[in-house]
Amino acid sequence: MKTDVKEQILDATVTLLLDSKDPESITVRDIAAAADVQLAMINYYFHSKDELLYQAVGALRNKMAGDWLSVKGKDKKMHPYLRFREMLIALCGMSVKYSQYMRFTVEYELTRAEIVSTQHTIPLIREICGNKRSETSIRITAYEIISTLQLIFFRAKDISAYLGFDVLEYDRMVEIIDTILAIHFPEYKNKYRVSKKL
């Protein structure tokens, strides 16, 4: 029963997010009404509106992230560096496509949530590096890459002005990913250079 109410609240919040142009304008009362639950139930299960929205956006992101997550299962003949690159491009493309929801999630992840976004990247980085790096180095690399991309997305307007181009434009986004990967994996820069601007 408890799980049902929690799921009911989460599902109602996802529906409100899909219908809303401004996720931050959604109130706890809106969510309670849509879920047909008492207001206190939201605080009981989620402790705050921010935590609920974070979980709802995460659920929404997971539903919409099929392409991104499926990259991990692609043909193992493809070099892990290229699979990692494709995964990052899919992730960033999804973030741009669903920016009205993702901006909130990025802010929450960068400032308050547990560090979980990197968990999907660690196995690929481990494959890329083999035994050349320690586990700590692999985890720091994963965090640096993901948090840098999150920050670029979160401050897209300012970073676009700083770099002199629109960072949300697909080709420029790929260029940024290739640049970040070249910094972290210089041994593959020329071998798998895809972006002509590098």
What are these regions (language model features)?
Residues 8, 30, 86, 90, ...:
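Amphipathic alpha-helical interaction segments
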Residues 89-112, 118, 156-158:
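Amphipathic alpha-helical segments used for helix-helix packing
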Residues 2, 6-14:
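Short, leucine-enriched amphipathic alpha-helices that occur as contiguous helical runs
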Residues 69-101, 135, 142:
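Hydrophobic alpha-helical connector segments
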Residues 122-132, 154-198:
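C-terminal peripheral helix-coil segments that are non-catalytic and often amphipathic
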Residues 8, 16-51, 55:
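Helix-turn-helix
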Residues 65-68, 106-140, 174-178:
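Amphipathic alpha-helical packing segments from all-alpha helical-bundle domains
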Residues 28, 58-65, 71:
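Short, basic, alpha-helical segments at the C-terminal edge of helix-turn-helix-like DNA-binding modules
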